[in-house]
Amino acid sequence: MLLTRQYIDKAFWKKLIAIGVPVSLQSMLFSLLGAIDIFMVSQLGEAATAAVGVGNRIFFFNLAVVFGLCGAVTVLASQYYGSGNLSGIRRTLAQSWFISLVVTLPFIWLYVVYDKEIVSFMADDPEYVGYAREYLVVTGLSLLGTAVVVPIESVLRSVGEAKMPTYVSIAAIVVNVFLNAVLIFGLLGFPQWGVFGAAVGTFISRFFQTGVLVYFFCRRYSHLLPTLSDWREGTVKKYRNKYFKVSMPMLIHDALWTGGLIVYSIIYGQLGVTELAIISFLSPIEGVLISTFMGFAVAASVLLGNDIGAQQYDRVEKTAWWYVLTSAVLATILFFAVWICSPLILNLLEKSPLTDKQMALNVCLVLALGMILRVFNMVGIGGVLKSGADIRYSIFIDTFGQWAIGIPLTYYTGMVLGLPLHWVLMSLLVEELVKGILTTHRIQSKRWINNMVDDDTSVTA
């Protein structure tokens, strides 16, 4: 199980940093944007805070669906790149673009036509519903850009180019923060639109990101743009089945997982608008902390996928544990840092519009504690198991942990026992513990290592 030092050399660190750091930075900035949005909107009250939080959860659900559909890009393109097959990368990108757009369009229609019904599932407070509807309709339209961006980002990372998506994301985030501040509060002579202004700012920034990324991708990586023959090959049964063999299980996995997150939001909403506002306020902050480790998961998926494609199986077995254990140790250090800084955090919460400051601090500490297990599982499942296309067992781990343990415990502790929010969240650690045990067993078994491209002819142009 333990790796030898022969594989952790200068070249390894160079690749890890080149992929992991930009991805973590991009993920952190994306989460930080959510935190800034929530902080700005929180000045309008708890109903507005809850509305934007729910809207972001719904957007995250669709983002995860697109990621699931494009999961085959990361798995297959990484292995194609390791085997030197560029035509396979182009074909996979064509397939992911087509499928992402086909699946995303019906969701956009639902969010525009049935906006009231959707947001009312979370809570029925009239002020909250009004805010949530206008936020969902506008941001829902921006999902079209997401369906274009995610496949490109997946391909670029699979070939070791993680900087370009990060730079573009940074620019988009700067645009988003500026527009949100201007349109929420009516600065520089613009109208004061409140929650609607936050939605408009998000909409514009996402299409700004789409346009800039497509432009640079076409200029610098034109050799990875699908040709007409690549689009045709993507419809061939052999390649179509290979793509769906990876992407459909990942779609089911991500849809069930994020669907579970929405169920959690519904339960929190039934506890009260205050509890929903606390979760909406703190979840983006938790996301910023967890996203610092996202680079480990993506780097593990890409680099292990490259090694599997190159059939370097001894290296794969020994470096897999390094990713998982190192990230878990770092997450533990981060938890203690949050715990030590709890007086400072409470002082900052005093300046927030949240009414129950002590509950918010307790929730913050529980979320920080849960990061240790969440990071372990994120890297183990989303990084290691994903690199070997072990999708079905990944689905089992996440689905069983969430729907058989996490959701029932949340409902029982919150709705039946009526425990405070922080104790409800504490019960969720049982879910993460069970998932961690299952992940450990699977990695040790080595049955997650599957070479999906060894039957393809190597093509370099």
Residue positions per predicted region:
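Generic alpha-helical transmembrane segments of integral inner-membrane proteins
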Residues: 24, 28, 32, 36, ...
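Short loop-to-helix capping motifs
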Residues: 125, 161-162, 272, 390-391, ...
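Short runs within selected transmembrane alpha-helices of multi-pass transporters and secretion channels
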Residues: 70, 139-158, 165-173, 198-213, ...
